[in-house]
Amino acid sequence: MAQVINTNSLSLLTQNNLNKSQSALGTAIERLSSGLRINSAKDDAAGQAIANRFTANIKGLTQASRNANDGISIAQTTEGALNEINNNLQRVRELAVQSANSTNSQSDLDSIQAEITQRLNEIDRVSGQTQFNGVKVLAQDNTLTIQVGANDGETIDIDLKQINSQTLGLDTLNVQQKYKVSDTAATVTGYADTTIALDNSTFKASATGLGGTDQKIDGDLKFDDTTGKYYAKVTVTGGTGKDGYYEVSVDKTNGEVTLAGGATSPLTGGLPATATEDVKNVQVANADLTEAKAALTAAGVTGTASVVKMSYTDNNGKTIDGGLAVKVGDDYYSATQNKDGSISINTTKYTADDGTSKTALNKLGGADGKTEVVSIGGKTYAASKAEGHNFKAQPDLAEAAATTTENPLQKIDAALAQVDTLRSDLGAVQNRFNSAITNLGNTVNNLTSARSRIEDSDYATEVSNMSRAQILQQAGTSVLAQANQVPQNVLSLLR
């Protein structure tokens, strides 16, 4: 080897090896400090790609496991609501069994039907209001797709069904029996303006009253809506201490006013606070059907209208007072008598399917013949259910039963079977979700282990590599110092 000064090849060789050991030491320290064998693609390009795919799968499967747990929660929420519906159905069945006993009177059946109706209403409420995260789970047929995998198409479906009294076939369930309906002409009396003026009129009290002296009404009669009594402020001619408010009687045939009960002294407490209605003129008034006829005409009902007194007779011969009604042909419309003797037909206000506010006339009918019902869109509903109902927002409303339900227990059993079927499906899908969660957990564990073998550092190997690199660094540094001294040997030739 030539002795040269310009180029120190030994030093260059040593520097190169020192750089290599420095790089190896840096790599070992990086892997030991991060815990990863692959810190960038340069460490292992193929391994980095494989590990990245594993990471995507692991993250996706972990989220899928959470999705499956959400699916279990939805199924549990739905089944909980179905359990409550089932409880109501069991009570309805119990009531139906009770109603089948011939010892029940018709009023007993009315009471039983009242609870059945309330139970069915509660079923409808549970159906319409039960929700999970804003999703109404029993309000309509629906399929919820739960993503339980890391890739497209890896799903489990939850099939939900609309469960209410209508879909269960119980919306017209009725155990009542039809009453025998009868009517009689109604005598309606009211109070209207007449020529019999009572202002400042004088009248004779009974002999047991104020001793036959003249009394004079000073002002208007007062009427108490609460008690149905009349009161008047009376001035007694020639009397002392007898002036004041008295209860008076009004003869409905001629409007004659007399002291009530032979009163001899005015009311101790004065005029009752509830006596607020002014009555200046009194007359027996015949039923005024003007308002009722206008309502019938507006509803498209034609025919002669008359006011009747309704009565209902059950199978045991018991008669129930049905109040007033307006009769047109064979139809009866529930009616109310106003203070002035006018008759108005009871109505139900609702929102139509086009969003407009409308009014329907209350008709007497239903399975018992005396329930107030309304006809809307060709369907018949109980007036109590249709009152205030929004058919645009909620088009489905249970119709009123027109007849007594045949084989009610069979219908209820079919409804229970329908609920049981859906509950079974929900129970099965919960078990399926549990199985999916277990499988997802196992898969995540296996993929995590596989990714670890690819990208995690082997500390035994890396510590050994670091130690080797450190030793090489120390040795290289020492040798480099010696290699740098080689050109100095050439100087000895120049001495």
From Swiss-Prot:
Subcellular location: Secreted; Bacterial flagellum
InterPro entries: Flagellin (IPR001492), Flagellin_C (IPR046358), Flagellin_C_sub2 (IPR042187), Flagellin_D3 (IPR014981), Flagellin_N (IPR001029), FLIC_barrel (IPR049365)
Keywords per UniProt: Bacterial flagellum, Secreted
Residues forming coiled coils: none
Statement: the UniProt record of this protein carries the keyword Secreted: yes
GO CC entries: bacterial-type flagellum; extracellular space
Induction cue: Inhibited in nutrient-poor medium (at protein level).
Molecular function via GO: receptor ligand activity; structural molecule activity
Function: Flagellin is the subunit protein which polymerizes to form the filaments of bacterial flagella.
Anything else known: Individual Salmonella serotypes usually alternate between the production of 2 antigenic forms of flagella, termed phase 1 and phase 2, each specified by separate structural genes, fliC and fljB.
Family per record: Belongs to the bacterial flagellin family.
Protein name: Flagellin
Gene: fliC
